[in-house]
């Protein structure tokens, strides 16, 4: 694995799982015909070892090896608390 892991920032939308969070990543995509920028959201499951995140927190997550069927990201830092 490279020493520069891919990182993303997003908002925690669920922390109901043990040691896991769901993060919503927003991006803007240009419409192919009309050219207007549209918001698109991706939901990613991430590993939160200490259960420190709450819903509404803005967090940074980094890519890691697969931890389960749906988790291959881990919490890097909490940017802002809700």
Curated annotation (Swiss-Prot):
CDD domains: Ribosomal_uS17 (cd00364)
Gene3D superfamilies reported in the protein's UniProt record: Nucleic acid-binding proteins
InterPro entries, sorted: NA-bd_OB-fold, Ribosomal_uS17, Ribosomal_uS17_bact/chlr, Ribosomal_uS17_CS
UniProt keyword terms in alphabetical order: Ribonucleoprotein, Ribosomal protein, RNA-binding, rRNA-binding
Gene Ontology molecular function, alphabetical: rRNA binding; structural constituent of ribosome
Ribonucleoprotein in keyword set: yes
GO cellular component annotations of the record: cytosolic small ribosomal subunit
Residue spans crossing the bilayer: none
Source taxon at top rank: Bacteria
GO BP annotation list: translation
Pfam families hit by this protein: Ribosomal_S17
Family: Belongs to the universal ribosomal protein uS17 family.
Subunit structure: Part of the 30S ribosomal subunit.
Function comment: One of the primary rRNA binding proteins, it binds specifically to the 5'-end of 16S ribosomal RNA.
Protein known as: Small ribosomal subunit protein uS17
